Each structure stands twice: as structure tokens, then as C-alpha cells.
Amino acid sequence: MVNIELKGGVVKEFDNGITAMEVAKSLGMGLYKAACACRIDGEVKDLRTPIDKDCKLEILTFDDDDGKRALRHTASHVLAQAVKRLYPEAKLAIGPAIDNGFYYDFDIDVPFTPEVLEKIEAEMKKIVKEALPLERYELDPEEAIELMEKKGETYKVELIKEHAGKGEKISFFRQGEFDELCAGPHVPDTSRVKAFKLTSCTGAYWRGDSDNKMLQRIYGTAFTKKEDLDNYLTMLEEAKKRDHRKLGKELGLFTIMDEGPGFPFFLPNGMVLRNTLIDYWREVHKRYGYVEISTPMMLNRSLWERSGHWDHYKENMYTTVIDDTDFAIKPMNCPGGMLVYKLQPHSYRDLPLRMGELGLVHRHELSGALHGLFRVRCFTQDDAHIFMTWDQMKAEIKGVVRLFDEVYSVFGLTYQIEVSTMPEDHMGDEKDWDFATETLKAAVTEMGKDFVINEGDGAFYGPKLDFHLSDSLGRTWQCGTIQLDMQLPERFELEYTGADGEKHRPVMIHRVVLGSIERFIGVITEHFAGAFPLWLAPEQVRILPISDKFHDYAQDVCKQLDMEGLRVSVDTRSEKIGYKIREAQLHKIPYMLIIGEKEVESGTVSVRKRGEGDIGAVRIGEFVDSAKLDIAEKNIW
């Protein structure tokens, strides 16, 4: 018999060798039908896993992230099986679950047109109706290679050969006639994939490397309820309209050219947006007691060896040789910040020391992974490093969370907090880890905030808080991080003199609030659908004279608004006023000021507000005061 601890701490006795699926069935048919996977002693497993020792068991449904991944991973197998049934010559590459869905890469000459995708979907529905059980089995590497070679799956053979020689068995899942190289977990049978949709097809290089063959990637999503699928597809259509790559082009914000894949060009409107965002960042950080530094973009190899990046991150770094010495363009700002701290001695009276840096970093990403501003090869990280004593830790964490609250609320973004704890591969004393982790939890709890635990997902040098932002479409974006670090101060031998006159090692917080300026611009562009709040809009006011004879008055109004600090332009083209209004609406200008005979005679302007339309004639000074108050309060509308 085995003792299994269930949800709520209840311990029940079961027969040795019982599967998680059988446990779920014993607890109720509702749970059994909803089960997608399980977690045994914190490790995600297949529901068919036999339990032969005392353990803690969690049954995972689609409401759990790992449950979603299991169901969507199974959906990717159903997709691959359908393609192989219809096109036996297709070669399979990889097909993981991803955020909000799944994909599968195929090497096939047949183009996956919308008509072909419909045909594949129909075959998938047949496979779902067949309720094929997913059965896990293992082979020695040699047997696995033989099986895949026999099936002509050259990409699978390549993957297996990478694991051969490690002394590990190779796991497969079988559903009907289909065998797939996979570690799992999966739902019990294909009938659980109740609601799914193939959403698009794109090209993707094998392993994301442009030197490799271009494959066809089919994207899809899957849910347990049709209603949830329909809601998601509606959101997806709205997201397409808000795509920051599309809006970036239409609004003149940024572009990415063939001459620099992954290296964004910011255009005039984009620079106004970017600089306004950075000005706000600086204003907030000054109020919260931060000083700002700037460290070189390129530093020599010895620094990166000392920080550990040369050994653990070199494949993502751009390197060069200067005067026979290896240099690297910085992928992170931290090591430079350590050197600044070490420039002068510090006393406990100097701490906490909060140092911010808007540092341009470069990281090599595979070409297949690049995506607008969301995944680039160079970006500005809004870093800060806080050097403190152990007893200042909780107060500093709270201070950072308060700063995050202020910044995110300005953009109308809510968040969820995730606490990532000590991984198996970690450095440092476990007592220090326990203290740091409990301090993180206590700080957010005392502030009345909820959090979830992400067991074992901390960095090797310390636990962290991750802030997952929710946008206007309900999508989540991981932007803010508060990362405790007990190791980098040790590597760089950072010190301060304590009240006892002795040398002590400070503790450090790495933190970012926006994460990457470029990525955050992408996020808020989609969040606001390009209709930025007045304070953030690249062009705040557009003056529209009805005809040429009102141009002089329009230019006078423009000068007055410009002197008051508003970002304003005049549309002097000889076009009908309706055309000018429609174009300003397409450009998502917050305010249009219409000028005709009546406005010139009365010294007023007729105001059209984005989203509201005509709000009437007002005096220029009155409009300026209202707009400046709106900007100062950073209102969202």
C-alpha cells in the first residue's frame, strides 16, 4: 500500500502501483473526466504513471497551466498524425505546446493553404472521435534510431542521436498507428481534445537557424470547451488588428529592415513615444531615490569570466578582438554596475544604494525566434541594482513593488505575482535561500498582495518575484522582475563597512520594471491598439483648417500650443475637411481642432476628441489648460 497526500493535505491509502488516473477516478467522475495530467512530488507526469511509493499527488485539469500544456501537446500529436495520414511523405520535425496553443513543423512540398488546413482539421476531428489512447513506451537509443529511420523521420533521428550516449532510454508515445518521439505528459486519449482550431501557417527554419531548411509551421490552439475556443478566436481577431508590427508601420513608430534582422529602427513618432516613456521612467526613479549610471556597451573578456557569462552565456554574446584582447558587447548590465559600486568604499550609512541604468544590451537570438519588438537582438533594459544589508531586504522589496504599482497603474495594466524558489542547481547556503525566499513572500503578503509559487524556477543565484501583466485583451506579459542575488556580490567581492567597523558583504536586488523598453512599447501599442493616452501620444493635437484662408490663424494656434509644450501639427493640405478628419482618426490623434470662419471670428477652436467626436468650441487657453491637466494626471481614455 502507498500513502498519497491529496489536495488540502488529506492523506489516503491506495494499492501499490495505482495510476494517477485511477486515483482521480476514485475521487469522482467529474475530476476524472477533467484530468489532463498530474504532479507527483512537484514533478509533472502523465496520468498513467504508476505510483509505487508514498507521495504528494495533484491532479491537473485544464485550469492549471501544466494541464493546458498537456492537452495542447496532445493536440499537436493529433495534428501530426492527421498530416501523416493525408500526406505520408511529410517528415516530422517538432511540435510543442506553447502559450495559448501549439505548433508543429513539417518538411513537405505541399503548401499548407487555407483549404489544406481545413482538410487537415477534418482528419483531426476523425482522430479525436476515435478516442485513441496515448501509450508511453521507451526504447534504447539504437532501437529508437532504427524505428525512426525505418519511418524516414530524419529530423527525429537527429534529435535522438543528440541524446545517444547519455545512458538514457528514449521515450515515445503511441496513438493508433502513430508513434511520436516525446517525453510527455499527455492526456489519456485523443477524445479529450474536444475543441481545437488550426489558426495559421508560417515558414520556420529547422531549429530557428537560417542556415537550415525552411519548414512549414502550422499553429493551432485547443480547449476543453467550444465556448472558450470561440472566445479565444474572437480575441485573436482583435489581436490581429492590434498587432504592434502592423500599427508600428501605420503610425510611423518603428521598422525592422533586412539589413538588420532583430535590430529595430525607431522612426520620428516612435522616438517621441520612446523618449516620453524614458522621461517618465527617470522621473519616477528620481522620486524613489535612485541614481542613474551608464556603463560601456563593450567590456573585455576578464569581466565576463568573472561574472560567469563567458562560461554560461557566450553563445548568446557578440564578441570581437581589440588589441589582441577578447571583448564582448554586453548582454546584461549587471557586471558594469558591480564595477561602479567598487569604485569607492561604502559604509552601512550609504545603504541602501539604488542604481538605475537604461542600458543597451545585445543578445544573439536565432532568426526564427525574432518577432517585431517582442523578440529582438538589441534592446534597452531598464535595470536597477539595489545594494543593501540583510535587514533592509524586506523594506527594499516593498519599495520596488510600490514603484511597480505606480508605473503599471499609469498604463492601466494589472498583474499577478509569481514567486520562483530555489532550483536544484543552485549556489549558496540553503539557510540564506530560505531567508531570502521567506522575505520575498512576507513583503508581498504584508502589502496585501496574492502570489503563486513557481517551485524550483528561481535563478541559480537567488529567488525572485515575476510580475505577469494583463493587457486589455486579457493576455499576460512577463515584464517586471525582482531578483535577489547573493552570489554576484561574492564574485565581485563587494563590501561595505558595518556599524561594528568590520567588512561585510551586501545583498543585491536586480530589478526591471518595464523589462525592455522596446518590448514594453510593443506591449502598450497592442494594449492601447495604438490609441495612446494624451501624455504618451507622439502627436497630441492636429489642427485642421477648413480652407486655405484659415491657415494663418491655424499657424498662430499651433505656435501657442507649441509654446505650452503640446505636440501639435497643422494639416495645410488642400483636402476636404472630412478627409482630414478621417485621416487623423486613422492616425489615432487624441485631439483635432477644427478651424473655420466662426472660430477665427470668436478666437476659439472646435474640438474633436478621439472616441467622443465633436465636443464644441472652446477658447484656446481653456483647451490648453484642460489638455495640460490631462497630461499631468496621465489619464487613460
Predicted regions and their residues:
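NTP/phosphate- and nucleic-acid-binding module
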Residues: M1-H73, V78-A93, I98-W637
